[in-house]
A protein has these predicted regions:
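A short, well-ordered alpha-helix in the C-terminal region of glycosyltransferases
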Residues: 208-222, 229-232
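Short hydrophobic beta-strand element within catalytic cores of glycosyltransferases
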Residues: 157-160, 167-171
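Acidic donor-binding loop of glycosyltransferase active sites
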Residues: 13, 124, 139-153, 164-167
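Conserved donor-binding/catalytic core segment of Leloir-type glycosyltransferases
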Residues: 62-89, 93
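Acidic anion/phosphate-binding donor-loop and adjacent secondary structure
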Residues: 27, 45-59, 117
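Nucleotide-activated donor-binding/catalytic signature segment of Leloir-type glycosyltransferases, i.e.
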Residues: 100-136
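Conserved acidic donor-binding segment of nucleotide-sugar-dependent glycosyltransferases
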Residues: 186-193, 201-206
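Carbohydrate-associated surface elements
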Residues: 21, 41-44
Length: 260
C-alpha cells in the first residue's frame, strides 16, 4: 500500500488533506513523492441544516427535571462505531447510571450489528437503525458522546453535533485531527471513569453545558461551514494552477488528489 500511494502521489501536481494530522502523516511517509506542501481543506458541514433549536422555541418543562439523554450517531456496521458503543455501554454507562440512574442512550445509525441491537435489551438504550433525519434525535439529547477507541476516517459526526449546539464528550481518538480545545469546544476523556464523570458534569451543570454548546457552534460556523471550506479549496486550486502555469507544459490542466 505504501508503494502504491507513493507512486500515485508522484502523478499529481497537488495534494489536499482534510486535517493537519493527515498532512503531517503524508509529509512524513512520502517526503520524496509530493511536489509541494500539502494543502489542508477541512471537512465541512452545512450549519444551516445542522442548527440548534432556538431557545425561545425549546419546550418548557414544569415541575420536573428532563431525563438525561445521551446520543451517538454513525453507521453501526463500521467496526470503530460498533466497538465504541459496546465499550460505552459495558464500561462507561454503568458509571454514569451510578450517578444518574435515569440516563438514556440513543444509538442512531444504519445497519446496527447483532451485538449493537442486543444492547437495547438492557433497558434505557434505544437502537434506531437507519433514520431519514438524525436532527430530531440530536436535538433531544443532553450530551453527544464519541467514545471511539479505533481511529480512521474523518470525524464529521462531531462537527455535525457541534453545529447543532450539542455538548460533546469524546475520547482523544474520537477528536483526533480536529482543531478543538478540550474544555472549550468539547470535553475529552480517555478512561471509563473520567469519561463518565465528564458526562455527569454536563448533565447536571446546565450553565457549563451551555458554554460548551455556544463555543462549539461558533467554531464550526466560523471555520467549517461550507462557505469557509469553499474558500480554502479556492485558495488551493489557485495555488496549484499558478504553479502549473510556470512549468514547461502550461496547457495541461493541474491535477489534484484528495487524501481522506
Amino acid at each position: 500500500m505504501l508503494r502504491y500511494e507513493r507512486q500515485t502521489l508522484r502523478r499529481f501536481d497537488g495534494v489536499l488533506a482534510v486535517s493537519d494530522a493527515d498532512r503531517e502523516t503524508l509529509a512524513h511517509l512520502y517526503p520524496d513523492a509530493i511536489r509541494q506542501p500539502v494543502h489542508v481543506v477541512p471537512t465541512g458541514v452545512d450549519t444551516a441544516y445542522f442548527s440548534p433549536v432556538p431557545r425561545d422555541q425549546q419546550p418548557v418543562t414544569r415541575n420536573r427535571q428532563p431525563v438525561p439523554s445521551l446520543i451517538f450517531t454513525g453507521s453501526m456496521d463500521w467496526l470503530p462505531n460498533e466497538d465504541a458503543m459496546l465499550y460505552f455501554c459495558r464500561e462507561i454507562l454503568p458509571f454514569i447510571r451510578s450517578e444518574e440512574p435515569l440516563a438514556r442512550l440513543t444509538i442512531v445509525g444504519r445497519a446496527p450489528t447483532p451485538a449493537v441491537k442486543k444492547l437495547a435489551d438492557a433497558g434505557g438504550i434505544v437502537v434506531t437503525g437507519r433514520v431519514d433525519d438524525v436532527r430530531p434525535y440530536m436535538r433531544e439529547a443532553s450530551v453527544y458522546v464519541v467514545p471511539l477507541r479505533i481511529g480512521g476516517g474523518t470525524r464529521l459526526k462531531i462537527f455535525e453535533a457541534m453545529a447543532m449546539g450539542k455538548a460533546v464528550v469524546s475520547t482523544t481518538i474520537g477528536a483526533e485531527g480536529l482543531p478543538v480545545t478540550n474544555g472549550t469546544h468539547v470535553m475529552v476523556a480517555d478512561d471509563p471513569a473520567s469519561f463518565a464523570r465528564a458526562v455527569v458534569v454536563l448533565i447536571r451543570d446546565a450553565d457549563r453545558r451551555q458554554q460548551l454548546e455556544v463555543a462549539a457552534r461558533a467554531l464550526v460556523v466560523e471555520k467549517y461551514d461550507w462557505s469557509a471550506v469553499a474558500g480554502e479549496l479556492e485558495i488551493a486550486l489557485a495555488r496549484f494552477a499558478g504553479r502549473r502555469a510556470g512549468e514547461i507544459n502550461p496547457c495541461k490542466s493541474p491535477s489534484l488528489v484528495l487524501d481522506t
